[in-house]
């Protein structure tokens, strides 16, 4: 196997490497309701750091690890929930794939003292770290970890390759988005050579839906609304749908893609109720060709990428839908 080549050689990883080498304790964390990129990046970096450093390495996610990613090595090491108030603070916190500190779901005082390293590929990232490595050229944060490992002279193994492969697979919509450049395919080849197994990973990620997941899928699709002369498609999951189907937020993964797949649709909108806070809604956007949904989400206080983005809004469903409709129609009006 030839030595892997970095995707972007001009990124300066030295501040991260220096902070990691000097730290006695490090916590890796990703955003609330984590996705494949956050979890895959976390697992790959954890596997490297437990070998590279003498310090204590741990992982903590407010919402743990989604079931479909629990096959990744080290996933059982993730601590879940609020950070214990009596626990010692680490020297370094590494936030992965998170555009804003608030999305980590931890209290502000948790970040007082430790060096906070922010590694992310969202253009809307708020640069909340003491050290910020934020680069929207990358297709996934996992691809950034690939380059970081090369900078650390850490070889790929099956655990690292599998984590990065999951991160890249899920954040490129199975290598379909425009961010999937020739360099990304070359990276994928390096990952497979190092032990990542595309078909078993695909089965775990895409072919392991629970029965309740099927129920919520049919209930969600029953809510489909076509708007903007057929150029936007809207689907919903309410508290009532959660109760009737017995599903949870993990089971809603990918539902918005059915709306985007409709011929003629340029923007898909998925509005789901927050499982914890009443009248708080998570709004997801998916774009097809002409609309930058990252900019659309930014109008509503959120962010993301050109083809995938989101925000969080409060109010009744009708109020939220009305606000989103104005922004969607405005985005479509130029095309």
Mark where each language-model region is.
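Hydrophobic helix-and-loop "lid/oligomerization" segment in the mid-to-C-terminal part
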Residues: 2-32, 40-70, 84-90, 170-299, ...
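Short, hinge-like loop/turn segments at secondary-structure boundaries
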Residues: 46, 74-78, 134-137, 286-287
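Short glycine/serine/threonine-rich phosphate/pyrophosphate-binding segments
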Residues: 36-42, 101-104
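Conserved beta-strand scaffold positions in the cores of enzyme catalytic domains, especially
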Residues: 116-118, 132-133, 232-234, 270
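Short alpha-helices
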Residues: 119-188
């Amino acid at each position: 196997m030839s030595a892997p080549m970095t995707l972007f050689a001009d990124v300066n990883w030295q501040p991260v490497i220096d902070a990691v080498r000097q730290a006695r304790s490090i916590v890796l964390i990703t955003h609330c309701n984590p996705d494949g990129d956050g979890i895959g990046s976390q697992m790959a970096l954890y596997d490297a750091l437990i070998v590279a450093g003498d310090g204590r390495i741990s992982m903590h996610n407010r919402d743990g690890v989604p079931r479909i990613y629990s096959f990744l090595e080290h996933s059982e090491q993730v601590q879940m929930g609020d950070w214990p108030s009596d626990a010692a603070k680490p020297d370094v916190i590494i936030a992965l794939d998170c555009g804003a500190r608030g999305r980590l779901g931890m209290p502000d005082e948790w970040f007082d003292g430790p060096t906070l390293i922010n590694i992310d590929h969202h253009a809307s990232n708020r640069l909340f770290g003491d050290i910020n490595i934020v680069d929207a050229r990358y297709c996934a944060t996992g691809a950034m970890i690939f380059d970081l490992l090369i900078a650390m002279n850490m070889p790929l193994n099956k655990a690292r390759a599998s984590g990065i492969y999951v991160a890249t697979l899920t954040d490129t919509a199975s290598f379909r988005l425009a961010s999937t450049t020739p360099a990304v395919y070359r990276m994928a080849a390096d990952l497979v050579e190092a032990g990542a197994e595309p078909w078993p990973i695909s089965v775990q990620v895409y072919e392991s839906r629970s029965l309740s997941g099927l129920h919520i899928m049919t209930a969600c699709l029953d809510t489909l609304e076509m708007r903007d002369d057929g150029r936007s498609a809207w689907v919903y999951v309410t508290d009532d749908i959660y109760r009737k189907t017995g599903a949870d937020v993990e089971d809603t993964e990918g539902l918005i893609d059915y709306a985007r797949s409709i011929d003629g649709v340029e923007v898909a909108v998925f509005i789901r109720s927050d499982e914890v806070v009443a009248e708080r809604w998570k709004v997801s956007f998916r774009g097809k060709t002409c609309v930058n949904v990252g900019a659309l989400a930014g109008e509503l206080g959120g962010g993301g990428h050109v083809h995938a983005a989101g925000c969080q809004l409060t109010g009744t469903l009708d109020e939220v839908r009305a606000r989103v409709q104005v922004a969607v129609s405005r985005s479509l009006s130029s095309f």
